[in-house]
């Protein structure tokens, strides 16, 4: 029932709605038209009212203006009457604009007009804008303009950072370069000093005092990893020197600007000789060389009658005159007069610039296999020893019985074989004393070998040597390419037994031939 009633009610309501809707649209249309007309009429009335108000305002303004004009005219007439007597007293040639200026003193017609008391003559060709500037001294048209007193001539190719450096003395191209004042009696001077200073002996515990000298450039490496491996190389050298009672100096200063690159070692060696007379041997070692036989010791008694010990091959030196017959990356030089004389004869071939370039041409022509490039310290030493053989060669020991210099490429891949077959203390090809990474240039931006191979090989060499140091403490690297370590023996209640057995300082193994 509820549903049927709903439908019926809905039908009736729908019919009535339709009827109302038709009548409603007519009514609404009429009302909307009336509203539009009413709104339009109101807008017209508002516009008329605005125009009327505007006219009233304009009329009021005109009247006020007329009143103002009348008042202004009366005031002007009064002012003119008062001014006429005054104007009659003013000369006829005076300008009206001068009335506002204060009275001036009489000016002589022959006097020169000035704004202030006379300071300096102003040239006739000076621009008006220049009058506010201080007077300038006369400038000769042929003079050279400068910002201040002349300090020094600056070459056109100078870098901006070089301007902060003090001026350098000119070096004559014909002058012979020297490392310093010529010393002729160093042996006697040193002997006297040693006698006067017994607390600094040149022989300690029966061994000649050695100072290991190494170093690198003053600035950082081109690549951060280069600094990392330089640090490892320094650590390796410190370990060896600590275990063998050798002093070490790491130099990063360029002591002589003329001797750069390979040549920086010469002034350093000479300086240390003269500053440490207690040192018997200066041992130079390149930064890219590593000790890989920590147990091996330099057989100094073998060199009792020699002053220079350097790795090389006599046949390559004397018969073939090869430029790689010797290697100046690692050598020992006795602190004596002979060595100072050798340095004095060696250094003049190294000053950078024209001397080094011209000497390089001579060395390339003289030595077998040498490429054409500027003079290097190694070629220069070989040339010196061959060209002045009678003077030098008697005191030179060309060492090849052990690896004072061991070329890395034929060694680093054999370390596992060496560990399996041999033992440290041999120093030769069975267990190389030094592994030298010639051509890798870990600190430079370029190298003669693949960078990745060089750094991996240096890592192997370092860990190979470091295992010999860690053995005393009961540790070893997990692998030759791993920086991580592992324990190789347990701790005991009798640790001194391990010290006596593994301490390199107490081990005296003879080097086998």
UniProtKB/Swiss-Prot annotation:
The keyword Transmembrane applies. InterPro entries: Glyco_trans_34, Nucleotide-diphossugar_trans. Residues 1-39 are cytoplasmic. One of its GO terms (biological process) is xyloglucan metabolic process. GO terms for molecular function: UDP-xylosyltransferase activity; xyloglucan 6-xylosyltransferase activity. Glycans are attached at residues 76, 110, 142, 174, 490. Its main location: Golgi. Its EC number is 2.4.2.39, 2.4.-.-. GO terms for cellular component: endosome; Golgi apparatus; Golgi membrane; trans-Golgi network. Residues 61-513 are lumenal. The keyword Glycosyltransferase applies. The chain crosses the membrane at residues 40-60. It catalyses: Transfers an alpha-D-xylosyl residue from UDP-D-xylose to a glucose residue in xyloglucan, forming an alpha-(1->6)-D-xylosyl-D-glucose linkage. Keywords: Glycoprotein, Glycosyltransferase, Golgi apparatus, Membrane, Signal-anchor, Transferase, Transmembrane, Transmembrane helix. It holds the Pfam family Glyco_transf_34. It is an enzyme of class 2 (transferase). It is found in: Golgi apparatus membrane. It is a single-pass type II membrane protein. Xylosyltransferase specific to UDP-D-xylose that accepts cellohexaose as substrate to produce xyloglucan. Belongs to the glycosyltransferase 34 family. This is Xyloglucan 6-xylosyltransferase 4. It comes from Arabidopsis thaliana (Mouse-ear cress). The lineage of its organism: Eukaryota, Viridiplantae, Streptophyta, Embryophyta, Tracheophyta.
